[in-house]
Amino acid sequence: MSPLSLPVATLGTPRIGPRRELKLALESYWAGKISEQQLHEDAFGLRAANWARQKSLGVTIIPSNDFSLYDQVLDTSVMVGAIPEIYAANGESVSLQTYFAMARGSQCGEQDASCAQSPRGSGVPAQEMTKWFDTNYHYMVPEFYRGQAFRLCSRKPVEEYEEARALGFQTRPVLIGPVTFLKLGKSTDSAFQPLSLLDDLIPVYIDLLHELAKRGASWVQFDEPCLVLDLDEAARNSLLHAYNRFAKEGPAIKIMLASYFGALGDNLDTALSLPISGLHVDLVRAPELLDQIVADGRSDLVMSLGVIDGRNVWRSNLPSLRQRLKPSIAKLGRHRVQLAPSCSLLHVPVDVELETGLASDVKSWLAFSVQKMRELAILARVLAGDQNVGLALAESECAATARRTSPKIHNANVAVRMRAIDQTMRQRATPFARRSEIQRERFGLPAFPTTTIGSFPQTTAVRNARAAHARGAMSEEQYDRFLKEEIARAVRWQEDIGLDVLVHGEFERNDMVQYFSEQLAGFAFTRNGWVQSYGSRCVRPPILFGDVVRPKPITVEWWRYAQSLTSKPMKAMLTGPVTILNWSFVRDDIPRSEVCRQLALAMRDEVRDLENAGAAMIQIDEAALREGLPLRRSDWKAYLDWAGDCFRICSSGVTDQTQIHTHMCYSEFNDIIGAIAAMDADVISIETSRSKMELLDAFRRYEYPNQIGPGVYDIHSPRVPETDEMKELIVLARTRLQDSQLWVNPDCGLKTRKWEEVRPALANMVAAARELRAASDPQIR
């Protein structure tokens, strides 16, 4: 490190590669096209490139063990031996086959050891998956039970540290801290507290720390983002207990404790009292922490200042940051300061320079992972007194000014519409009880009506046609004809298997958010701006930079064509305003609530156009509602108020005869059920198959009045559930809700699955519903 620079650290970087090389390797391995050895070689290549890239950009504290073939929490479960018996691991080492069975489920084959403990001949399900704090990344939920034993079953952190060292990189290994790991998990015993396992877990971490120290590691990064949550005294005491034991029984290795995604709040004193050598704080989400740690922090504590936004794509105003940070760094002392992103850069794309199709002005406002590391290096130099970065500072300030004053940002007509929103636009004209009677008469559906969430498999043929159309190799007329053939085929097949409410399959859509945002003013789009959602699943979030306008109808003609092919109800499919917001990179110059209301007005226009075209069922997906929930309960009400308000603005312009559906996934509803009910959707479908219908307990306790489609088919796994398996889930749902409330559907859309998986699974689902109808009280048929 230059004497005219502060240390620059990253907490983690994107794993997928600049062009999604990890996705290609994983899917090739799962398809049997490459060997396990080749997969490991490809993964090593990505790690080596990441380390080299960081060093070349001026990062001086480089992480290792931030890479994962699927998920870092799953890696931790495997590392400590937290592997459910159903996956048949031997407790000493874990095969890649078992690892992926935990992640994806498994269809039993001759070589599938995990099937040895399967209660079904058809394989094992994947572990439950949920959102990582309030991000769009997913982790595999650890499973804990009373008396659980832990042991070091994977040396991955040591192996990757040694890999880096052999290449000449001195790294800081990254570990998920034991308290966060236990708090992220679940137990089937509701009375059991996973934190009670802490003393059994700590020795595994201590063994690992000794191994790392023996191999030359001087620092280790413990991620404890649970520190930004509402913690009780038991959790705070657990943190104190764990890190005191590390200090007492561990090696002389320095610990950088990383918190991120929010303020430490009432956990700050706990964090500052831990026997650690460094503390990372998120100064993007919690800028007030800077003054607090300057005033209250220990004089021997290295402070890692998370000053560059690791979760959004906007370029920083470096002169403004310099002005803000300089006095605080002077008080702390340069020897006690590291500069870092607010969190891991896992949540942003790799490199904006790969984008050749963005407007030059919009591109100049952006910073992806590579650019953020470069910004940190420049900021580190200027704060250390380097006078040779004046041009870089001027360019940064110029970009910030250009963005702030650009005519692309503000639209006067949008401002007029926003001021015109009144209470009549925020609610349905009639209560649900009356609407449901009208809709029941209109549709005449059987008990346990069957439907899907919207999308069908995006086959190679569909993707190739879309790509050919995008590059001009397929004309608009040819592409339109191709899509109509796909829709017609899907409609015929749905009728053949007996689904009650049909969908058109969404073959024209690249992504449920991108498809809509591409047809709304105020958005920009990337070609290589991918971020990891889970495993090989990558998403390319739109960039919402300005006021939102819908120039023309988006879905009406596709719905009209699909409905013309059948006499059964055809759901129109939309993505809701809250989900578009939460799955986009959003402008940071106005409140998110205001941005969301702009989106709600645009989608309200689409809903009304669909109804005018004849659509009787309109689904407005709010899959991402819960992930926008603030991490601190005290902030929940404000978010839920404006999020629900935006959904109702979007959905309430229709008549009583029109049935509004919504879909939510990866959600826990116990603590927000009142807000869900206030959205007043006629039908809500939710993901419940992995949780064995546990999520429905919230609806039962609340006496939720509207209709619900609990998912009976886990679409995140390739395995095909049997009819009896889905019947069991429906029976569980019937113990929690009235039969008249229940719909039968998969957990989520089927875009990422294959037809050979979808066809038998949906046929089994329809059979399950029909068998239950036949066996039920005739009055509900």
From Swiss-Prot:
Presence of keyword Amino-acid biosynthesis: yes
EC number(s) reported in the record: 2.1.1.14
Residues at which 5-methyltetrahydropteroyltri-L-glutamate binds: 20-23, 131, 537-538, 583, 627
Binding site for Zn(2+): 663, 665, 687, 748
Binding site for L-methionine: 453-455, 506, 621
Cofactor note: Binds 1 zinc ion per subunit.
Cofactors named for this entry: Zn(2+)
Keywords: Amino-acid biosynthesis, Metal-binding, Methionine biosynthesis, Methyltransferase, Repeat, Transferase, Zinc
Principal EC category: transferase
GO terms of molecular function: 5-methyltetrahydropteroyltriglutamate-homocysteine S-methyltransferase activity; zinc ion binding
Annotated residues for binding of L-homocysteine: 453-455, 506, 621
Keyword Calcium attached: no
Pfam families: Meth_synt_1 (PF08267), Meth_synt_2 (PF01717)
Known pathway: Amino-acid biosynthesis; L-methionine biosynthesis via de novo pathway; L-methionine from L-homocysteine (MetE route): step 1/1
Active site, renumbered: 716 (proton donor)
Catalytic activity: 5-methyltetrahydropteroyltri-L-glutamate + L-homocysteine = tetrahydropteroyltri-L-glutamate + L-methionine
Record GO biological process: methionine biosynthetic process; methylation
Function in brief: Catalyzes the transfer of a methyl group from 5-methyltetrahydrofolate to homocysteine resulting in methionine formation.
Family designation: Belongs to the vitamin-B12 independent methionine synthase family.
Stated name of the protein: 5-methyltetrahydropteroyltriglutamate--homocysteine methyltransferase
